[in-house]
Amino acid sequence: MPDIKLFAGNATPSLAKKIADRLFCKLGDAVVGRFSDGEISVQINENVRGADVFIIQSTCAPTNDNLMELIVMVDALRRASAGRITAVIPYFGYARQDRRVRSARVPITAKVVADFLSSVGVDRVLTCDLHAEQIQGFFDVPVDNVFGSPVLLEDMLAKKLDNPVVVSPDIGGVVRARAVAKLLDDSDLAIIDKRRPQANVAQVMHIIGDVQGRDCIIVDDMIDTGGTLCKAAEALKEHGANRVFAYATHPVFSGKAAENITNSVIDEVIVTDTVPLSPEMLKVAKVTQLTMSAVLAEAIRRVSNEESISAMFSH
């Protein structure tokens, strides 16, 4: 493997350490802190000239701070003559602001962030389960989008589910749910038809598919407040579902997520570590966190060796 160097911001230190361990290397020596007035300070304390550099940093909450850390780290490494810089962004914040709905006077912030990263000197982006895959087209540099499905699928198979049915929480998630159903021995598919009157508020309408007496697996890319998820689980149970498991790559968990999940009829919520869990969420017994370190470490190895990323998911 070429001379690679891994650096990490303050967003996901635990995940970064696990990735480094799997690649049998240490995280680079860098100090990412704050000046007394709150401005971000970055100091790279080792030689990176000509190196293949990977910066591991989710742009999760506090989103703006973590994004700015990433941008400033890229600039510091670029000015230190790094050979190639790959931004490893396990969770890409602002991804939900990817379009103008009905010509509303709103920004397409996902494009703004992509422009930031491209302009500051990122050579490549490696991310995980983008909210909308077309966001890759916002970048002027190559983007590799890896998936959490291998990690989540392993847990699904270990549960020995009873006549499982994969459930999409909305029409937009059908492609994702169908892909998981195919991997799960071509399991049946169900869809929850809902309407969202305002942000983070969802009204479940009806269920398309048979869930009576079956274990239901709700799959999504992220869980935010959990309101939509909890109402979906309630609707499934009302339609005779046996157990309800929710799988998502990104545990955003904002607002009343802890309260919503604790008081819900969901049997278990399984997520990954692309976003660290808050102390409050760590206390929620229904939440299980898996690690994406193996998938991301292998993706980094392949990028560094100029190998195919898509071959990781060609099963």
Curated annotation (Swiss-Prot):
Residues reported to bind Mg(2+) 2: 170
GO MF entries: ATP binding; kinase activity; magnesium ion binding; ribose phosphate diphosphokinase activity
Catalytic activity: D-ribose 5-phosphate + ATP = 5-phospho-alpha-D-ribose 1-diphosphate + AMP + H(+)
Recorded metabolic or biological pathway in which this protein acts: Metabolic intermediate biosynthesis; 5-phospho-alpha-D-ribose 1-diphosphate biosynthesis; 5-phospho-alpha-D-ribose 1-diphosphate from D-ribose 5-phosphate (route I): step 1/1
Domain of life the protein comes from: Bacteria
UniProt-listed Enzyme Commission number(s): 2.7.6.1
Keywords: ATP-binding, Cytoplasm, Kinase, Magnesium, Metal-binding, Nucleotide biosynthesis, Nucleotide-binding, Transferase
Any single GO CC term annotated in Swiss-Prot or TrEMBL for this entry: ribose phosphate diphosphokinase complex
Cofactor descriptive note: Binds 2 Mg(2+) ions per subunit.
Primary residence: cytoplasm
Subcellular location: Cytoplasm
Cofactor: Mg(2+)
Binding site for D-ribose 5-phosphate: 196, 220, 224-228
Annotated binding of ATP, by residue: 37-39, 96-97
Record carries keyword Cytoplasm: yes
Function of the molecule: Involved in the biosynthesis of the central metabolite phospho-alpha-D-ribosyl-1-pyrophosphate (PRPP) via the transfer of pyrophosphoryl group from ATP to 1-hydroxyl of ribose-5-phosphate (Rib-5-P).
Subunit structure of this chain's protein: Homohexamer.
Protein name: Ribose-phosphate pyrophosphokinase
Annotated organism of origin: Shewanella oneidensis (strain ATCC 700550 / JCM 31522 / CIP 106686 / LMG 19005 / NCIMB 14063 / MR-1)
